[in-house]
């Protein structure tokens, strides 16, 4: 029976079990991951992150081909054991874990490339946490009809791809946002192949202050259920509201989630507009468990 030494971490309440497996010799099964993430019988988490060197995984080899400095791969899994392409909060916590575990060195202001299933993502250490360049984004998936429990009227959502799929839904006010029961999976028509993360948003009043937009969001994450925060979901929500607000909408946003607040910034690059996510990353405790 193997012993798994792990660290519990969180970014605005989006929590993860992280463990180091540099040589790729300790993969977990979907069943083991689901047991670890169970909040009653396991450690409890929204997902599991394995720290593995990119050269030890086929997906990591692709990351190295893209950027030879992407030594580390974020092998991320949802709470149900399914593999995920990307996690905006998770990658910040992952880099904090690599630093605290002395697997990498990263000074304030420096950037570290990390391999993910959606490509290489650059993470910068800041005075207040970490900022990750989520790369190019695109409208994808059209405008599916979204039904959620306790919301009596179906709404049109906006599909956005950030390396993982999102559908963003605008609600009328705070009371609607509070009433949605996200313990149930929102129903999408047409249903995207492989599912999607679904974000429900309302604007602050005023929507824009001092050139910065602000919205409030709740999310149902594919494979994990409702979480206190979703980093790529916050970015998708800000992008959607900017899209709806028109050409004079700002390129910088605060997104309030149940677990705190994250920053989203859109900026031009040579290969198109990118979106960056900034926020805290905390390591909570370490532990060990016996794997069945």
From Swiss-Prot:
The keyword Isomerase applies. Disulfide bonds: none annotated. The record marks 166, 221 as: Could be important to modulate the pK values of the two catalytic cysteine residues. Keywords: Amino-acid biosynthesis, Cytoplasm, Isomerase, Lysine biosynthesis. Pathway: Amino-acid biosynthesis; L-lysine biosynthesis via DAP pathway; DL-2,6-diaminopimelate from LL-2,6-diaminopimelate: step 1/1. Pfam families: DAP_epimerase (PF01678). One of its GO terms (cellular component) is cytosol. InterPro entries: DAP_epimerase_AS, DAP_epimerase_DapF. This is Diaminopimelate epimerase. The gene is dapF.
